[in-house]
């Protein structure tokens, strides 16, 4: 049982790390050269000064929705980890971790929806930056976090507390 708790906790911490990096780092869309776009800033590399020049992203409604969904997924994942620890130490033997599992399933839905909205609107990014580009590693991390959070939520729902 202690090995299972260790694995579930490690999986949850891995999901948290993936979500933090995916939400806060600067590579949701990479352009040719060293330029990249993220959820918060549009950054370009200035060769003359050897510095990054960043500006706020446009006021697209869909981009604001992706921002909100990714932050919501972080909050829900943190909440589910806190709930798991609370339930682990206060719940009676034989109890199920329904609240933790439900929060983690909501996390997976929020990540899925945010990444899907971003993928659907990739053509708008290409209109603004016609030089091309591709999805960055933060976008890929969001897609990796989705199935992990889904599996984690299902595991939590089926997990019983034993002594």
From Swiss-Prot:
Alphabetical keyword list: Glycoprotein, Membrane, Transmembrane, Transmembrane helix
Membrane topology: Multi-pass membrane protein
Main location: membrane
UniProt superkingdom: Eukaryota
Record's keyword annotation contains Cell division: no
InterPro entries: EMP_3, PMP-22/EMP/MP20-like, PMP22/EMP/MP20/Claudin, PMP22_EMP_MP20
GO cellular component: plasma membrane
Gene3D superfamilies documented for this protein: 1.20.140.150
Gene Ontology biological-process entries: apoptotic process; bleb assembly
Compartments reported by the entry: Membrane
Pfam family, one: PMP22_Claudin
Residues bearing glycans: 47, 56
Family of the protein in this entry: Belongs to the PMP-22/EMP/MP20 family.
Function statement: Probably involved in cell proliferation and cell-cell interactions.
Name the record gives this protein: Epithelial membrane protein 3
Taxonomic source organism: Homo sapiens
Underlying gene: EMP3
């Amino acid at each position: 049982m202690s090995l299972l708790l260790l694995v579930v906790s490690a999986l949850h911490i891995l999901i948290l790390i993936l979500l933090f990096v995916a939400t806060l780092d600067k590579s949701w869309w990479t352009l040719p050269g060293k330029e990249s776009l993220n959820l918060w800033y549009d950054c370009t590399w200035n060769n003359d000064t050897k510095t990054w020049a960043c500006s706020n992203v446009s006021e697209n409604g869909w981009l604001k929705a992706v921002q909100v969904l990714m932050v919501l997924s972080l909050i829900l994942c943190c909440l589910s980890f806190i709930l798991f620890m609370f339930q682990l130490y206060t719940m009676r033997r034989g109890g199920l971790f329904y609240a933790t599992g439900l929060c983690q399933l909501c996390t997976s839905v929020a990540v899925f929806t945010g990444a899907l909205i971003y993928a659907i609107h990739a053509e708008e990014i290409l209109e603004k930056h016609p030089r091309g580009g591709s999805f960055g590693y933060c976008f890929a991390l969001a897609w990796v976090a989705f199935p992990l959070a889904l599996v984690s939520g299902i595991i939590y729902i089926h997990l019983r507390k034993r002594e």
